Structures are given as C-alpha cells and as structure tokens.
Amino acid sequence: ACKPKNNLCAITEMAECCSGFCLIYRCS
C-alpha cells in the first residue's frame, strides 16, 4: 500500500504502487 511521504519516492516505487502520486506517496 502507499503511505503519505513528503519526499519524492523512487521510480521503482512509483511504478509499482504510487502511480501519479509520487510527490506525496511511497510504497511500503
């Protein structure tokens, strides 16, 4: 699932879970 995060998430995390929400979410 994705959790709120202030920092950018990794490209791999975005591809797997965060979709277009990389700015505020990360995979965990």
UniProtKB/Swiss-Prot annotation:
Domain comment, as recorded: The presence of a 'disulfide through disulfide knot' structurally defines this protein as a knottin.
UniProt modified residues of type 4-carboxyglutamate: 13, 16
GO molecular function term, any single one: toxin activity
Tissue expression profile of the protein: Expressed by the venom duct.
Main subcellular location of this protein, as a coarse class: secreted
Family: Belongs to the conotoxin O1 superfamily.
Signal peptide: none
Descriptive protein name: Gamma-conotoxin-like de7a
Protein's organism: Conasprella delessertii (Sozon's cone)
Residues where Serine amide is found: 28
Modified residues (4-hydroxyproline): 4
GO cellular component, one term: extracellular region
Alphabetic keyword roster: Amidation, Disulfide bond, Gamma-carboxyglutamic acid, Hydroxylation, Ion channel impairing toxin, Knottin, Neurotoxin, Secreted, Toxin
UniProt function note: Gamma-conotoxins may act on voltage-gated non-specific cation pacemaker channels (HCN).
Compartments (UniProt record): Secreted
SS bond partners: 2-18, 9-22, 17-27
